[in-house]
């Protein structure tokens, strides 16, 4: 989503 580094949770 946002600035995911690995997956796409909330990072």
UniProtKB/Swiss-Prot annotation:
Q: What is this protein's name? A: Cytochrome c oxidase subunit 5A, mitochondrial
Gene Ontology terms describing biological process: oxidative phosphorylation
According to its UniProt record, where is this protein located? Mitochondrion inner membrane
Disulfide bonds, paired cysteine numbers: none
Share what the entry says about its subunit structure, partners included.
Component of the cytochrome c oxidase (complex IV, CIV), a multisubunit enzyme composed of 14 subunits. The complex is composed of a catalytic core of 3 subunits MT-CO1, MT-CO2 and MT-CO3, encoded in the mitochondrial DNA, and 11 supernumerary subunits COX4I, COX5A, COX5B, COX6A, COX6B, COX6C, COX7A, COX7B, COX7C, COX8 and NDUFA4, which are encoded in the nuclear genome.
Principal subcellular localization: mitochondrion
Sorted alphabetically, the keyword list is: Heme, Iron, Membrane, Metal-binding, Mitochondrion, Mitochondrion inner membrane, Ubl conjugation
> Does the UniProt entry include the keyword Mitochondrion?
yes
Extract one GO molecular function annotation from the record.
Answer: metal ion binding
Q: Which domain of life is it from?
A: Eukaryota
The Swiss-Prot or TrEMBL record describes its family as follows: Belongs to the cytochrome c oxidase subunit 5A family.
Give the membrane topology: Peripheral membrane protein
Question: What does the PTM comment of the record read?
Answer: In response to mitochondrial stress, the precursor protein is ubiquitinated by the SIFI complex in the cytoplasm before mitochondrial import, leading to its degradation. Within the SIFI complex, UBR4 initiates ubiquitin chain that are further elongated or branched by KCMF1.
Biological role: Component of the cytochrome c oxidase, the last enzyme in the mitochondrial electron transport chain which drives oxidative phosphorylation. The respiratory chain contains 3 multisubunit complexes succinate dehydrogenase (complex II, CII), ubiquinol-cytochrome c oxidoreductase (cytochrome b-c1 complex, complex III, CIII) and cytochrome c oxidase (complex IV, CIV), that cooperate to transfer electrons derived from NADH and succinate to molecular oxygen, creating an electrochemical gradient over the inner membrane that drives transmembrane transport and the ATP synthase.
Which cellular component terms (GO) are annotated to the entry?
mitochondrial inner membrane
Give the pathway annotation: Energy metabolism; oxidative phosphorylation
């Amino acid at each position: 989503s946002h600035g995911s580094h690995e997956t796409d949770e909330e990072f």
